[in-house]
């Protein structure tokens, strides 16, 4: 059986172009992007958030699953990247690109989907959890798979990953996105 190549949404292509032009090398990978699209699509009237817009690749994947009644708010601390990412979504009033610290998102919380790829993930994990609505989905990528429990990174217990996987307010799991990378996906308990 021959598999057709999966189409990449046009705004993702535009954001990848911005990343290339800006020399930005930390965009989310397509495997995570498809997960983001699925999460956004699961909350068609939700408030979707992203910390760490970068060039807008993750934002574009979230946008590709955005329902007509949903809103998407993302924040990037680099002014130039935020400006360029905002231009990709300038024609869609459902999307807001903020410039500054990740805490700017708090005024838009609680979130039905939160892709935490920037501020908050490491420096305020409890604050990240508190931004989720009951039943809200949290996606954190850029982990290295670990066959051990508790999970390890570079020979040590990965306290950050362990925090999210065992948090009492979350039902969480780790999924393999590529052979060399994984993501933590969690839902806030009702």
Would you name each region that the model predicts?
Residues 1-28, 41-42:
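Rossmann-like AdoMet
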Residues 24-104:
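SAM cofactor-binding core of SAM-dependent methyltransferases
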Residues 107-114:
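A short acidic, Gly/Pro-enriched loop at the edge of an enzyme's catalytic core
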Residues 99, 121-122:
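Structural motif corresponding to alpha-helix initiation and N-cap regions
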Residues 122-190:
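C-terminal substrate-binding/active-site "lid" region of AdoMet-derived donor-dependent transferases
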Residues 48, 114-117:
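Hydrophobic beta-strand segment of the Class I
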Residues 51, 77, 118, 142-143:
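Generic detector of well-ordered alpha-helical packing
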Residues 54, 120-121:
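Conserved glycine-rich SAM-binding loop
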């Amino acid at each position: 059986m021959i598999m057709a190549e999966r189409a990449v949404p046009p705004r993702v292509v535009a954001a990848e172009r911005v990343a290339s032009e800006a020399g930005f090398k930390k965009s989310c990978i397509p495997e995570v992007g498809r997960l983001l699209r699925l999460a956004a699509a699961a909350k068609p009237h939700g408030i979707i958030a992203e910390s760490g817009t970068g060039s807008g690749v993750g934002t574009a994947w979230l946008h590709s699953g955005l329902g007509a009644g949903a809103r998407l708010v993302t924040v990037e601390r680099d002014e130039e990247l935020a400006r360029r990412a905002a231009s990709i979504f300038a024609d869609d009033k459902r999307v807001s690109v903020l410039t500054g610290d990740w805490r700017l998102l708090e005024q838009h919380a609680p979130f039905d989907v939160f892709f935490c790829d920037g501020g908050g993930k490491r420096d305020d994990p409890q604050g990240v959890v508190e931004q989720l609505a009951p039943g809200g989905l949290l996606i954190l990528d850029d982990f290295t798979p670990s066959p051990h429990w508790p999970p390890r990174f570079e020979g040590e217990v990965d306290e950050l990953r362990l925090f999210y996987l065992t948090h009492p307010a979350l039902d969480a799991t780790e999924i393999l996105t590529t052979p060399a990378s994984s993501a933590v996906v969690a839902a806030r308990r009702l």
